[in-house]
Structures are given as structure tokens and as C-alpha cells.
Amino acid sequence: MKAIYPGSFDPITYGHLDIIKRATKIFSEVYVVVMENKRKNYTFTLEERIKMIEECTENIKNVKIDYFRGLLIDYLKMHKIDVIIRGLRAVTDFEYELQMAMANKEMCPNVDTVFLMTDKKYSFISSSLVKEVAYFGGDISRWVPKSVERKLRKKVNGV
């Protein structure tokens, strides 16, 4: 069975990777899809985000990396995917994710959303937090892979 794990991944974190690895044990194919939202300002380009995900998941066989600009439901229909994977860090995530799951179900009744709880050691990590700490020179090595850390340091230092 195929599933999709959509997100902006700006940048990908160990929390994201935890969800990806666990999802690949449940589903035969996991599409990690970088979504583009015109209302969002990104630190990394679409191409950079895709490259980081490819580097971080190269040893996971049943992962497919892709991108999409549009409604998630349209991507699901195009690729015949019926399961959306979402990671939950805390109760506050659940409120938003439940709303999105219900909206997706309304638009496409055969789609189910599977929620995976993030490992507690990653439960406070978000891409926004990682970027903020990096901008102020803090240690982010426990939250992102080395390759991602190097790229983010280059961005924040203007190199």
C-alpha cells in the first residue's frame, strides 16, 4: 500500500526522518512530497529541499521523493494514493491536523490520514525552531543531519 508524507521540509529535521523511517515499516511505498505554498516564504529553494531529503533518505529503499504545487488531494488522485501520513508532536498539532484530515476526507472520501506520534526526543523540534536557533548561532546538531546543518549554516551566514 502506498502512502504520502507531505510537507515543506524547510529544512528536513530528525523529527521528519523519524516519521519517514517508521512509515516505511508500515507501507510498501512512502512518497515524501515537498509541497509548495505560494503564501509561504522559504529559506531553501524547492530544489535544495528535495536534494536534502534525497541525501537523508538515500539508504531507505521504499521512499520516493517528489514535489507538488497545488492541492494535496490532486496529487493523491494522480498517483492513486489513499493514505496521508502526518506526524504529531503535541496536542496543539492534533487540532490543526484533524481539521486538515477532515477537509481532505470531505474532498476525497476514500483518503485516510494516519497519525504517527513523533519520538519524544523530537517532540519539540520544528523547522522554524531549527532555523531560529541557527540564525542566532546556536547548536542544532541534535536536531538535523550534518549535511542539513552545513547547508543551513551557509544560508544564515550568507555564504
Swiss-Prot record:
Relate the protein's function as given in its record.
Reversibly transfers an adenylyl group from ATP to 4'-phosphopantetheine, yielding dephospho-CoA (dPCoA) and pyrophosphate.
Annotated Gene Ontology MF terms? ATP binding; pantetheine-phosphate adenylyltransferase activity
Catalytic reactions on record:
(R)-4'-phosphopantetheine + ATP + H(+) = 3'-dephospho-CoA + diphosphate
Q: What is its EC number?
A: 2.7.7.3
- Pathway(s) the chain acts in: Cofactor biosynthesis; coenzyme A biosynthesis; CoA from (R)-pantothenate: step 4/5
Task: Site (Transition state stabilizer): give the residues.
Answer: 16
Q: What is this protein called?
A: Phosphopantetheine adenylyltransferase
Supply the NCBIfam families for this chain. coaD_prev_kdtB, cyt_tran_rel
PANTHER family recorded: PHOSPHOPANTETHEINE ADENYLYLTRANSFERASE
What positions does the entry give for substrate binding?
A: 8, 40, 72, 86
Keywords assigned by UniProt?
ATP-binding, Coenzyme A biosynthesis, Cytoplasm, Magnesium, Nucleotide-binding, Nucleotidyltransferase, Transferase
Q: Where in the cell is it found?
A: Cytoplasm
The coding gene here is: coaD
- What Gene3D superfamilies does its record include? HUPs
Entry-linked HAMAP family: PPAT_bact (MF_00151)
- According to its UniProt record, this protein's enzyme class is transferase
Question: Which residues does the record give as ATP binding sites?
Answer: 8-9, 16, 87-89, 97, 122-128
Q: Which organism is it from?
A: Thermosipho melanesiensis (strain DSM 12029 / CIP 104789 / BI429)
